[in-house]
Each structure stands twice: as C-alpha cells, then as structure tokens.
Amino acid sequence: MSKYQKKSDGELKRTLTKLQYDVTQNAHTEPPYTNEYNRHYEKGIYVDITSGEPLFISTDKFKSGCGWPAFTKPISQDLIANYRDESHGMIRTEVRAKNSNSHLGHVFRDGPEEHGGLRYCINSAALKFIPFAEMESAGYGEYLKLFKESN
C-alpha cells in the first residue's frame, strides 16, 4: 500500500476548495491562464492535492501557451493512469493520478520533441506545489535527487 492515501470524500469536501473538488473528483477543467501554476516556475515538486503523492517536478515544466501548467513527463509513469476521453466532442487522453484516481488533466502529443513529444496539460487545482527548500521538511527528501539527475 502506498504511503500516499486519498482522503475520504467528506474530508475532501472539507479541505479542498469547490474548484479543487470539482476538478479532481468530477473531472472539471479550471479556467485557462488565470490558474495558480500556469506561470509558476519556482524550483520544486508538484504533488496530488488529494493525497500528497509526488507527480511532477519543476524541471519538466515548460511554457506551452495552453493556459495551464504543462509538463513533458510525470516523475514516473507508474503514478499516472491514462483513459480515453470522448467528452465535449473531442477524443483526448485523460490523465488521472493512479493512486487517488483524481482527475489531473489531459496529455497531448504536441510537446517538445527533444523531450519525448508529450504535453501533460494539468489543472493547477489538482496540484499542490512544494518549494525545493521545503521538500525535506515536508517529507519529500527522497525526491531531491531528481533535481541533480535533471541538471
């Protein structure tokens, strides 16, 4: 069992904002461009807002112009589940956190070719950012090595 456990629905309703709950639990999409992490490039780690599980690191984030945070890859493919999404008259690939089953966003094949060609377009409301300087004290010290590997 993972050390990162999703909270109960009641606890999620008490601790998340309405937008965070709607995005993660009801697969809604937050408005583009005005969300918290769209233009956020501080060094650190992005974790699942519902479970705390690490999902993305800042060194894999890039300016895509799509209006939401965009990453070239998750920390590990084992953390992500992909599903076919035919909503809104489109065919897309939905991205969910595998452990908590929280909706994160979508993945597209128009990312930087030199980094694999994928663009993980993720709702800020599904994420919590842990600054690099606070990772150890927040319990994410084991992920500090990812920053050394990516330099």
UniProtKB/Swiss-Prot annotation:
GO biological process entries: protein repair; response to oxidative stress
UniProt-annotated catalytic positions: 121
Cellular component, GO, one term: cytoplasm
Secretion signal, residue range per the UniProt entry: none
Reactions accelerated catalytically: L-methionyl-[protein] + [thioredoxin]-disulfide + H2O = L-methionyl-(R)-S-oxide-[protein] + [thioredoxin]-dithiol
Residues passing through the membrane, by range: none
MF annotations from Gene Ontology: peptide-methionine (R)-S-oxide reductase activity
Every MsrB domain range: 9-132
EC id: 1.8.4.12
Swiss-Prot/TrEMBL keywords: Oxidoreductase
Family to which the UniProt record says this protein belongs: Belongs to the MsrB Met sulfoxide reductase family.
Protein name: Peptide methionine sulfoxide reductase MsrB
Source organism (scientific name): Mycoplasma pneumoniae (strain ATCC 29342 / M129 / Subtype 1)
Gene from which this protein is expressed: msrB
